[in-house]
């Protein structure tokens, strides 16, 4: 019996919550009005209710324990190793905690928002504008479900394994060759480029027209300048000039790489290279289109965005698409007409609503530290775990921007600039 008790005490148990009032066995505590027979602890589960000097055996016949001068003698019956409790089955059933108790509210998993074309039905009455997206506090955020939109862009190497989604297995990239050429070349496969965007709002007119600087992060806190961008002052729509020369942000500068231009409502942005629109020798090429869902009625929730990119060839070269060519279609026209053979369609990853923090959260793996409506991650429907690009705030004027294949630094920077621009129909 002692060995059995020691084994029970050594076995780790699980404490379960229950509202039942447990009927505790007799003990030295709260024993007023009871007849105490000097047996306490596990021994009382084995004794007969009528005679405390009798032990109930498995056969039901009592075994009397008599103390003598030389030891203990037993009469009638035998003692077995498994004692039988004098309590009835109904009492034992009452003592047993229910295994059908519902989960605690704290352990209930957070529901994942389904992927859709708009977050309108997930609006929160306390939010007045687009809800900011917060970085997840842990790395075990549930992965959101992504719906297949049917895009058939020839992005052949996006179907990577999920361990590469967070970039832990990817090598950190560096500039290869002249900076003017590197910023427009597609990223190497299996390489993650970690960048930082700094917004400079100091000066006479930089409150309305700040300058954005893109730096590639290196070891030991070092950074390498890559690109700079600024909105043109005299333009009917938002028009950003992007250059490798931070001192000369004009289309005539030698470092001019391309531009970002929006429509009147600020819902669609077009990214072009430094080619000329009507030049047959060096025509202007479409590098990206960023589409934000309109939100005219003031619905709340994160901004939903679609990014269109030129497809990739077998030798990892970008397909040339010229929207100014009368004989061809641009990225936006191809997407509208469902001609997706040479178009790659990306979407922002669906955030998860967290009731505890009252915000939408995404797992940025430590690269984003502040909540912002500008925070986003771009994925392809064929592999939602492969994060093509992520962008988010770390301080008031500092943002991180990480990208990988098939994007180039110029495309990623232009997509990030579109997030900075004001959108009348999206707020």
Swiss-Prot record:
Protein location: Cytoplasm; Nucleus
InterPro entries membership: Tubby-like_C, Tubby_C, Tubby_C_CS
Keywords, in A-Z order: Cytoplasm, Nucleus
A GO biological process held by the record: protein localization to cilium
UniProt xrefs under Gene3D superfamilies: Tubby Protein, Chain A
Bias-annotated ranges (Low complexity): 57-86
PANTHER family membership: PROTEIN KING TUBBY, TUBBY-RELATED
Residue intervals passing through the bilayer: none
Chain positions covered by the region annotation Disordered: 48-174
Keyword Nucleus appears in the UniProt entry: yes
Any one GO cellular component localisation term in the record: cilium
Family label: Belongs to the TUB family.
PROSITE patterns, alphabetized: TUB_1 (PS01200), TUB_2 (PS01201)
Protein name as annotated: Protein king tubby 1
């Amino acid at each position: 019996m002692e060995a059995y008790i020691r084994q029970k005490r050594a076995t780790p148990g699980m404490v379960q919550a229950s509202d039942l009032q447990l009927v505790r066995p007799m003990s030295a505590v709260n024993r007023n009005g009871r007849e105490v027979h000097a047996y306490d602890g596990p021994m009382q589960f084995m004794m007969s209710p009528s005679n405390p000097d009798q032990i109930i055996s498995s056969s039901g016949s009592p075994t009397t324990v008599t103390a003598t001068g030389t030891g203990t003698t037993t009469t009638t019956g035998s003692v077995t190793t498994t004692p039988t409790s004098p309590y009835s089955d109904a009492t034992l059933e009452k003592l047993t905690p229910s295994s059908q108790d519902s989960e605690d509210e704290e352990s209930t998993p957070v529901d994942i928002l389904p992927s859709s074309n708009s977050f309108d039905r997930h609006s929160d009455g306390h939010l007045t504008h687009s809800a900011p997206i917060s970085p997840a506090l842990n790395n075990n955020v549930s992965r959101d479900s992504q719906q297949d939109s049917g895009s058939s862009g020839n992005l052949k190497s996006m179907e990577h394994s999920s361990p590469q989604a967070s970039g832990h297995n990817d090598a950190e990239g560096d500039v290869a060759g002249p900076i003017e050429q590197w910023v427009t070349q597609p990223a190497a496969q299996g390489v993650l480029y970690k960048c930082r965007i700094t917004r400079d709002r100091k000066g006479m007119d930089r409150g309305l027209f700040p300058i954005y600087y893109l730096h590639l992060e290196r070891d030991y806190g070092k950074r390498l300048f890559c690109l700079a961008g600024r909105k043109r002052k005299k333009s009917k729509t938002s028009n950003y000039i992007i250059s490798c020369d931070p001192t000369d942000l004009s289309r005539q500068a030698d470092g001019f790489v391309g531009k970002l231009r929006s429509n009147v409502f600020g819902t669609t942005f077009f990214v072009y290279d430094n080619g000329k629109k009507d030049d047959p020798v060096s025509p202007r090429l479409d590098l990206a289109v960023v589409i934000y869902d309109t939100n005219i009625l003031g619905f709340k929730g994160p901004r939903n965005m679609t990014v269109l990119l030129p497809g990739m060839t077998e030798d990892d070269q970008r397909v040339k698409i010229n929207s100014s060519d009368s004989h061809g279609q641009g990225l936006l026209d191809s997407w509208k007409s469902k001609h997706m053979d040479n178009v790659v369609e990306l979407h922002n990853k669906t955030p998860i609503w967290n009731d505890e923090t009252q915000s939408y959260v995404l797992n940025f793996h430590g690269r984003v530290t502040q909540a912002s409506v500008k925070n986003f991650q771009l994925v392809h429907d064929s592999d939602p775990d492969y994060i093509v690009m992520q962008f988010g705030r770390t301080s008031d004027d500092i943002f991180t921007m990480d990208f990988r294949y098939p994007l180039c630094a110029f495309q990623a920077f232009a997509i990030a600039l579109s997030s900075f621009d004001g959108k009348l129909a999206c707020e």
